[in-house]
């Protein structure tokens, strides 16, 4: 069943994959997809947030089997739950093969779920986060749809932003304009990218500013369109992202200012975690 808004807020605030959902309108909580659903935390997050229909896409059948076997612990979210449909599939292929469009695309902590040898993760091909992938995700979103991607640390988030912006650029959309579609939340452990199919409304921007006032963030990694320069310090706004929104910095400039390689990547060289 559904939970009340106040209870949902309490449950969503501790997890960065859920925090942006506090800004999503109630009438845009119909169709959601989790790419790399793993053990199901993102599925539970969407259930708490009140989404009506959730496609849980997981390429590893072992994860699906474990969650089903532990139904008493997991709440049976992979066991014929009335609001969840489980798909054993690769995320991008799944989205390409369907005509369905989503109010929300959620991807949380995929490296922990997919890389057996964490020490070699930089050499692992990952087609989920290339700029080509972001174009496909945008195609899978409804007109007012959003996408949430939870990263692990600062430079992963900046590379996510680079790939998202390159995706827009390939469609002929200028960086300055594309920044109207982007929010970043600089949680110390799980910095998060939020992408919206259309520019964020003033109401949504206010909602994100309220979130930044509520949760602890640090390291100047936040960005919400429309925050005035005088407020940058209060909101821990990232200076590079602010400069891009103002039209004063391009993708090459962002990469040049970073202490690791945060430039965009393509399907031809999909080494997202190769940052050094």
Question: Can you say where each PLM-predicted feature lies in the sequence?
Answer:
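Conserved S-adenosyl-L-methionine
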Residues: 172-188
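Mobile active-site "lid"/loop adjacent to the S-adenosyl-L-methionine
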Residues: 62-63, 70, 74, 81-82, ...
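Flexible, glycine-/basic-rich loop-and-beta segments that form/coincide
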Residues: 180, 190-250
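General small-molecule cofactor/ligand-binding pocket signal
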Residues: 84-87, 183, 222
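Class I S-adenosylmethionine
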Residues: 1-76, 81-82, 163-168, 172, ...
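Short loop/turn motifs at secondary-structure junctions
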Residues: 28, 50, 100-101, 143, ...
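Extracytoplasmic/lumenal ectodomains and periplasmic regions of secretory and membrane proteins
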Residues: 230-276
